[in-house]
């Protein structure tokens, strides 16, 4: 089973969208194996967005992601990365397909409600950055026996 990292950003948390997003994830069949509400500090934000250091939008990005709590999750399932990315929609909500999280709940690229790993390498890095191994659980969903 593939794992991926997904985070409801401060705008999503502040707008009360955690429950709606978790519901969509679970209805799609992905399993949440770790989750926590947390406040990201600057040090963690810089590690998370290290590939953007030096870019013109970096300080705004750090300021936004540290502006309020986030809900961090590890999801597990077949093709979890691609599935989560399809559910989220394109980074620019105006280009996202109808029915995706970003199309339904976001209006601006810089405030687009949700983040998700874009590759197995970034998923591994982000999971290790936000979760200790003992925070990631292994369990069987009741429905798994019926599938």
From Swiss-Prot:
Enzyme class: transferase
Residue stretches in coiled coil: none
GO biological process, one term: GTP biosynthetic process
GO cellular component term, pick one: cytoplasm
Matching InterPro entries: NDK-like_dom, NDK-like_dom_sf, Nucleoside_diP_kinase, Nucleoside_diP_kinase_AS
Protein EC: 2.7.4.6
Binding site for ATP: 9, 57, 85, 91, 102, 112
Reaction catalysis annotation: a 2'-deoxyribonucleoside 5'-diphosphate + ATP = a 2'-deoxyribonucleoside 5'-triphosphate + ADP; a ribonucleoside 5'-diphosphate + ATP = a ribonucleoside 5'-triphosphate + ADP
SMART domains registered for this protein in UniProt: NDK
Compartments (UniProt record): Cytoplasm
GO molecular function: ATP binding; metal ion binding; nucleoside diphosphate kinase activity
Cofactor: Mg(2+)
Active site residues per record: 115
NCBIfam families reported in the protein's UniProt record: PRK00668.1
Assembly with partners or alone: Homotetramer.
Similarity annotation: Belongs to the NDK family.
Protein name: Nucleoside diphosphate kinase
Gene source species: Listeria monocytogenes serotype 4b (strain F2365)
Source taxonomy: Bacteria, Bacillati, Bacillota, Bacilli, Bacillales
């Amino acid at each position: 089973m593939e794992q991926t990292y997904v985070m409801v950003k401060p705008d999503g948390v502040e707008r009360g969208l955690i429950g709606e997003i978790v519901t969509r994830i679970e209805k799609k069949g992905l399993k949440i194996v770790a989750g926590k509400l947390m406040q990201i500090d600057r040090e963690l934000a810089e590690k998370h967005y290290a590939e953007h250091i030096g870019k013109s939008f970096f300080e705004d990005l750090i300021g936004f992601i540290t502006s309020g709590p986030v809900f961090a999750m590890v999801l597990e399932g077949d093709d979890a990365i691609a599935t989560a990315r399809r559910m989220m929609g394109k980074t620019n909500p105006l280009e996202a397909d109808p029915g995706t999280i970003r199309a339904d709940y976001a209006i601006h690229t810089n405030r687009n409600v949700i983040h998700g790993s874009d590759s197995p390498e970034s998923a591994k890095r982000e999971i290790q950055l936000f979760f200790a191994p003992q925070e990631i659980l292994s369990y069987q969903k009741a429905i798994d026996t019926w599938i």
